[in-house]
From Swiss-Prot:
Gene behind this protein: P33MONOX
InterPro entries according to UniProt: P33MONOX (IPR026759)
Compositional bias ranges of the Polar residues kind: 191-210, 233-243
The keyword Cytoplasm is annotated on this UniProt entry: yes
GO cellular-component term (any): cytoplasm
Record keywords, A-Z: Cytoplasm, NADP, Oxidoreductase, Phosphoprotein
Keyword hit for rRNA-binding: no
Phosphoserine: modified positions: S182, S183
Enzyme class, spelled out: oxidoreductase
Protein name per the record: Putative monooxygenase p33MONOX
Subcellular localization: Cytoplasm
Provenance organism: Pongo abelii
Length: 305
């Protein structure tokens, strides 16, 4: 093209170092801006009387420009410049408002769906008893999940208290009223009970009379969990029950005394018993012959052979 300049040494006088802005000998191709533009017309310097030439600004037809200007309250540009773009923007105005409304609706729907999924997961995992505290940013509509959780928690507490109250007269009725020495406190039976209660799933041991004592004791020994245990005696005078201590463990001093008494009484009792070992009377068993077959010799032979 006519505006393309030949390659010249890059000697510029406008730099801060004068003519030595680039070293001499380094060539730089003068850039033609026409190569990068779609318009093939060459670039010309602006005319000297630029202020007297009437010109219109080129306004790009962007999508939401008119809506943004209306929202910001800016004054619209002159109508001849905005003819095409305002027509396009007026067509696009309704879908923009619709898109904003659907954006708000989708946000609320997504938040609601998230809360429902959280509630469903907590219900499955059994975490609803502790209640659900909403996030600070949640709206008042979503705080109903907190109210639902609290209501469920209170309902469960009330039903639990009712069942406990119903259970107490039933357990009181299950204890026979003709018991001479009844325990002053209702105790729940369990497998591993501590203190006064015995681990007998059968009848109450305090109701057994002395006539059938041996028969009932054998039956309780048969059905008790940890073998025969001494029966519980209740003190009728005091309100506290006597704790079961089992067999008293002897102290080491008592053990030494008992051993000394036993040695003094019968010294032969502490001697170890004699073991009757049959003596071999010179009979030696003949050595057993190996029952080896020729194929087994391959296993016993070292690998070097």
């Amino acid at each position: 093209m006519a505006s393309r300049q030949p390659e010249v040494p890059a000697l510029e006088a406008s730099g801060p170092l004068g003519k030595m802005s680039l070293p001499i000998g380094i060539y730089r191709r003068a850039l033609s801006y026409d190569d990068t533009l779609e318009d093939p017309a060459p670039m010309t310097p602006p005319p000297s009387d630029m202020g007297s030439v009437p010109w219109k600004p080129v306004i790009p037809e962007r999508k939401y420009q008119h809506l943004a200007k209306v929202e910001e309250g800016e004054a619209s540009l002159p109508s001849p410049a905005m003819t095409l773009s305002s027509a396009i923007d007026s067509v696009d105005k309704v879908p923009v408002v619709k898109a904003k409304a659907t954006h708000v609706i989708m946000n609320s729907l997504i938040t609601k769906q998230t809360q429902e999924s959280i509630q469903h997961f907590e219900r499955q995992a059994g975490l609803r008893d502790a209640g659900y505290t909403p996030h600070k940013g949640l709206t008042t509509e979503e705080t109903k999940y907190l109210r639902v959780a609290e209501a469920l928690h209170k309902l469960k507490l009330q039903s639990g208290e009712i069942t406990k109250e119903e259970r107490q007269p039933a357990s009181a009725q299950s204890t026979p009223s003709t018991t001479p020495h009844s325990s002053p406190k209702q105790r729940s039976r369990g497998w591993f009970t501590s203190g006064s209660s015995t681990a007998l799933p059968g009848p109450n041991p305090s109701t057994m009379d002395s006539g059938s004592g041996d028969k009932d004791r054998n039956l309780s020994d048969k059905w008790s969990l940890f073998g025969p245990r001494s029966l519980q005696k209740y003190d009728s005078g005091s309100s506290t029950t006597q704790a079961y201590r089992g067999v008293q463990k002897p102290s080491p001093l008592e053990l030494i005394r008992a051993q000394a008494n036993r040695m003094a009484e019968d010294p032969a009792a502490l001697k170890p018993p004699k073991m009757d070992i049959p003596v071999m009377e010179g009979k030696k068993q003949p050595p057993r012959a190996h029952n080896l077959k020729p194929r087994d010799l391959n296993v016993l032979t070292p690998t070097g052979f």
